[in-house]
């Protein structure tokens, strides 16, 4: 293997974590934020990364579950299903590190995917103005993962290809 400086850094970080068990402490997917939505009426699988051997405790709505991070730093807990609600607090703690997510909703989670059909905006529809005026749901939440680059028939510059090489497909977003 003859990596460049960046590749050597990735290899070093991976080997360091494997040898020491230090994976940078408590880490979660970008989906875990204030105002996020969890699926109702199904067991809740909460997972992330912590240092090897760290006990991670997760609590929400009076429930609490713990797990120990394995030798790759991975941990996962499963909590009992929750009913629909809009003001839960999800707390995740590993040692002195604590992450608290407020205004968590429990309800229906829909995953939508596509290309041009997903780029179509409601205000472009024939009945869009009427539909928008009737849309009055303060508990509706959207996690819109927009692509980092346009996918039309255009040549991509080197900066675009570099970001794709680094698995940066989407723009940063929140709920």
Go through each PLM region and give its residues.
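Catalytic His-Asp segment of secreted/periplasmic serine-dependent ester chemistry enzymes
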Residues: 1-23
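Cell-envelope and extracellular/periplasmic
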Residues: 24-175
């Amino acid at each position: 293997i003859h990596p460049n400086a960046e590749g050597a850094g990735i290899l070093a970080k991976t080997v360091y974590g494997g040898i020491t068990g230090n994976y940078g402490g408590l880490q979660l997917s970008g989906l875990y934020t204030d105002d996020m939505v969890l699926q109702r009426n199904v067991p809740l699988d909460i997972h992330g990364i912590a240092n090897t051997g760290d006990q991670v405790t997760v609590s929400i709505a009076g429930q609490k579950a713990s797990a120990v991070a394995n030798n790759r730093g991975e941990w996962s807990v499963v909590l009992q299903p929750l009913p629909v609600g809009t003001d839960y607090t999800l707390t995740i703690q590993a040692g002195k590190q604590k992450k608290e997510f407020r205004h968590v909703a429990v309800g229906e989670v829909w995953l939508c995917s596509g290309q041009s059909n997903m780029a179509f905006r409601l205000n472009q529809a024939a009945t869009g103005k009427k539909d928008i005026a009737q849309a009055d749901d303060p508990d509706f939440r959207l996690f819109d993962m927009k692509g980092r680059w346009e996918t039309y028939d255009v040549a991509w510059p080197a900066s675009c290809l570099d970001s794709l090489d680094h698995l940066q497909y989407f723009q940063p977003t929140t709920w």
